[in-house]
Each structure stands twice: as structure tokens, then as C-alpha cells.
Amino acid sequence: KYFTSFGYIDQESFFKSRDFDYKRYNTRSNIDIKVNERINFSVDLSYRQDIRERPAKTALSNIWIDLSTAQPIFPTRLSENMVIPDPSISSVSYSGSTTGNRNPLARSDRNVFGTYDRFDNTFRGKIGFKYKVPGITGLTLRADMNLTLLDRSEKTFRKPYNVYRQNLDTNELILEGVGNGVSSISDSQFRRTMVYPLISAEYIKEVGKHNLKVLILAEQTTRKFSMFSATRKNLFTTSIPELFIGSENEQTNDGSSGPDIGRKSAVARV
């Protein structure tokens, strides 16, 4: 027997920029093989990719903060006929916040604020074996091996943008602040592996009006991880969001690895 499925999800956000959408691709395949009356094999495989693309990792919470400090007397966008002093840098309208560099619309737009891209690739596999012992009716031996692999990639890109207050009387733009004052880019990779073997023996027998059930099993869980990250600031240009564009004078690196879970257990039940 076998079963195979494919899935796709495209979830739209409620922002006009559509920069908070979520996508997922997944596939699954299960195969059960009956060799004979005593031996059975099973193989279960699944893969899933989650894609999150937004202006920032914590953009949603910061958008509500910017909205709470914005004043309704200021326009949400600059007038189209305004002459931008520096067209090479994105420009947004002043929202009335005391810090001067806040704008909720800027935080919801990847073209203005920057980008945060996260890709999760998850693989799960299971191989099972079941054997009915001849000569001992009701005794079944079973062995399973489970494996889970997670590969996560995250990239964060920040670029400065100017926040202008518009003087309608003089048709002049006044610089109130700069969002993301320093351009930067960071890239991180995270990998995690979990191995879960299990063996069991089950004995079932009817004795008159009674049922006898005995179960003995042993299992082990091992999970290991590794991660590293790198960041550079003061990019030579914001048109190429890659690490090599940043200055080597302002770079940081980090990383770690090791086991975070290890467990063994045995169970017996009558």
C-alpha cells in the first residue's frame, strides 16, 4: 500500500504592500509492504518548506508602536509633486512621533525599510519493521527509526530612509530624522538533527475469559544543533543585499553547536 500527497499554501497578509505573505510547500509519501504473514515493512517520508518574507523579523509589533505614536494631523505620504532632496534614498512622510524617524507605512514596505527572509526546510523520515515470532502465538517484535532534519536560513537587510515633514505653505521638505541610520546585512544558518530509535516486544494471549497483554519497549532521543551568523554594516551600496558589500571594518561573526537533548527510557507494562 502507498499514499502520496502534495500541498501548497499561499497566505496573503492584510497589508497593501503584500510584504507579509506566507508560503508553504509540502509533500508526503507513505509505503507499507507486507512481505508475508509475519514480516511487515513501512516507510514514511515528508518534506516541508516554509517561506516568510517581510520587512523585519519583529515588524508587526513595531508597526503597532509606530501607529500609537503617530498623529492624524500629518499626511501619511508625501505629495507627488514634491522634489526629494536625495532621490537615491527612500523618503517617507513624518508621522508626528517625538523621535522623528518613525513611520508605520515604512515598516510595512520592503522597498523602504529593508528585508527579512526566512526559509525553513524540514525533512522527516521513518522506517518501521514488524515481525510476528513463529512458534509463539501473539508475540510481535517491532523496531522503528525516526529522523528529523531542520535547515533554517535567515537574512536581514536594513537600509536607511529619510523622514520628511512637509511644509505646505512653502512647499518645502524638512528632514525630521533618518530611519535605520546605518545600513547593515546579516546572514545566519541553523541546522538541527533529531534521531529517535524505538524497539518493542508485545505479547497478547487469551487465557479463558481473560486477556493477557505484555509490552516492553526501549527508546532513545538524540538532538544536535549547529548555527553560525555574520553581520556587516556600512554597505557600499544598498542595491545588492549581500555580505561582501559591507565594510570589513565593522563585521561580526558568531556561532555555536552541540547536543541540546539526550534521553533514554525503558517501559514495561502488563
Short names for language-model regions:
Residues 1, 13-20, 28-122, 142-143, ...:
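Surface-exposed loop/interface segments of Gram-negative outer-membrane beta-barrel transport/assembly proteins
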Residues 8-12:
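Transmembrane beta-strand segments that form the barrel wall of outer-membrane beta-barrel proteins
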